[in-house]
Amino acid sequence: MRNGRWLVAGAAGLVLAAGITYVATAGPATAGHPAAPRPASKPTPLAVVAVTPADGAAMVAPDTQVQVTASGGMLTQVTVASGDSAATGQYGPGSTSWSTRWGLKPATSYTVTVVARNSKGAATTEVTHFTTKRASRILQVSSITPSSGETVGVGMPIIVDFNYDVARSDRAAVERALEVGSDVPVTGAWFWASDSEVVFRPQSYWPAHERVLLTAHLTGVPGGPGLWGGSDLSYSFKIGDSHLVKVNLKTDWARFYINGSLARTIPVSGGMGGYDSFGNDFYTTSGVHLTMGSYDSVWMTSPNIKPGQPGYYHELVYDDVQISDSGEYMHQSPGGWWCLGHENCSHGCVRMTADGAAWWRHTAYRGDPVIITGTPRVLAWDNGWGYWQESWSAWLAGSSAGPVTTTALAEASLGAPSAGPTSPAASSPAPIPTTVG
């Protein structure tokens, strides 16, 4: 018995002496049989990170998209920073990719810091640097209509004027950088009214009581040779009650609707029609006008006619609401009360009763649609804010990026807007019009 026990122990000693190091990981043993050994598991590789632009890159175009990818793991942190500011970006599916959403500042050094983790949680950290090229000119917004915080009508456009002309090849990029948000998403499009002015209009009127936010992500946006956007800005305004005015100059009556219900019916008198020897057209324009401002009073002067010549006048007219750039207003009739509701007697404006004109001046927002019918003269789309004169297909033809859907605003989306240039709301006194009365 003693010899047998020694032999078993010796056998075990022979196994150990053979230098086999994986006995501890062996599977379960059965009676009379030693456990089978298993090889040790290999360590999980670390995630591999790739960054574009490459480390040390210089003269990077400001509209370059920074792209980060991770293979064999997930991205858990990405920052593209310059000083205290960081570029906005978004992760791709599965957090294996990340890219900047908007442009970069010109002539700026950026540091990219990336952390990725493999399936075991082990981290890979990558830090790279690059520098963007300098701009010879900086594209900026010089004015925006309506004013920040203003309450406007359902037809109100957003009019953005730039300090430089924008090249046709870069207009789509500029449009995409002008992000419009609203409580209820609507379809709309930007339209280039000139080389330096772009206008946003919904396909249909804005819903009443809507908040609207414009965010101009202009940083790093190209505008032409050597022209790059240098900074962002945002501002908001509100759509008020729905005001819709229908003026029929065949019957000489105007109907005013508020939130879909008829609020008032007012007798009016439009342009008398015809032309004078000075080339003045005395027809009121038909079409979809927008109210452009309200005034206590406006001095109205006959265009192209000097004092002492037939047809000259220069008179102060009260309770004025401007509806075009060719001198058309809705206002209190300065006389000829018998014409209201019966005959067109004015030089092109829409005359109203004293109480009706005062009520409308105090009720109207900028951007209220005023639809005038019954005359042979048609409002041009570029006469004031005649943008609704363009069909939707014609409006899209003036866009480089095509239709967009406004971004739905969260309840907290409208914080304090950044300071930006806006056009002032109209106030008395108004500029002297070219066609009046």
Question: Where on the chain are the PLM-derived regions?
Answer:
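Acidic, low-complexity Ser/Thr/Gly/Pro-rich repeat segments typical of extracellular/periplasmic
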Residues: 3-241
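Extracytoplasmic/secreted envelope proteins and their assembly/folding machinery
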Residues: 67, 111, 127, 159, ...
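Short amphipathic beta-strand/extended segments with alternating polar/hydrophobic composition
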Residues: 90, 191, 262-271, 382-384
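Short, charged beta-turn/beta-strand-edge "cap" motif at the junction between a beta-strand
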Residues: 116-117, 218-220, 260, 297, ...
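A short, structured loop/turn motif at beta-sheet edges
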Residues: 119-120, 133-135, 207-208, 261, ...
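Exported/periplasmic cell-wall-interacting domains
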Residues: 154, 241, 283-286, 301-437
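Structured segments of extracytoplasmic/periplasmic soluble domains
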Residues: 161, 165, 169, 297-298, ...
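Gly/Pro-biased beta-strand-loop elements
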Residues: 226-338
